[in-house]
Amino acid sequence: VHLTAEEKSAVTALWGKVNVDEVGGEALGRLLVVYPWTQRFFDSFGDLSSPNAIMSNPKVKAHGKKVLNSFSDGLKNLDNLKGTFAKLSELHCDQLHVDPENFKLLGNVLVCVLAHHFGKEFTPQVQAAYQKVVAGVANALAHKYH
């Protein structure tokens, strides 16, 4: 991902304030609510029968945290996202058969959740930088697909 020094600084500064547990669960939960067809990848997560069930599901929250911890790794390696996400790309492609379009959807949901959490601090410039990052991460995760 090609970010200016200013964009990198904005992304890093905001990310330092992110509560990964809370934001991860909320982002994944919202993905499952807004795009219900993504639920098929989470059969083992138990009750996903309603928005309330999804948003309060401990497995959704735990996996959301895991996703954002991986995203944090990506932020530390913006110059090598494909390398950083190579194993996860392989797993999601070869074993889990996740549609790579879902990575873009989750990235966009994450941007919305960050905007919701940070309000005025999430300026248009910060949003633009995060859109570049989530697009880069989605691209890296889709890399192993043929």
From Swiss-Prot:
Binding site for heme b: 63, 92
Modified residues (Phosphoserine): 44
Keywords: Acetylation, Heme, Iron, Metal-binding, Oxygen transport, Phosphoprotein, S-nitrosylation, Transport
N6-acetyllysine: residues bearing it: 59, 82, 144
Gene Ontology BP terms: hydrogen peroxide catabolic process
Residues covered by the Globin domain: 2-146
S-nitrosocysteine modification, residue list: 93
Phosphothreonine, modified sites: 12
Modified-residue entries (N-acetylvaline), positions: 1
InterPro entries listed in its UniProt record: Globin (IPR000971), Globin-like_sf (IPR009050), Globin/Proto (IPR012292), Hemoglobin_b (IPR002337), Hemoglobin_oxygen_transport (IPR050056)
One GO molecular-function entry: haptoglobin binding
Tissue expression as described in the entry: Red blood cells.
A Gene Ontology term for the protein's cellular component: blood microparticle
Key word Heme present: yes
Biological role stated in the UniProt entry: Involved in oxygen transport from the lung to the various peripheral tissues.
Family statement: Belongs to the globin family.
Protein name: Hemoglobin subunit beta
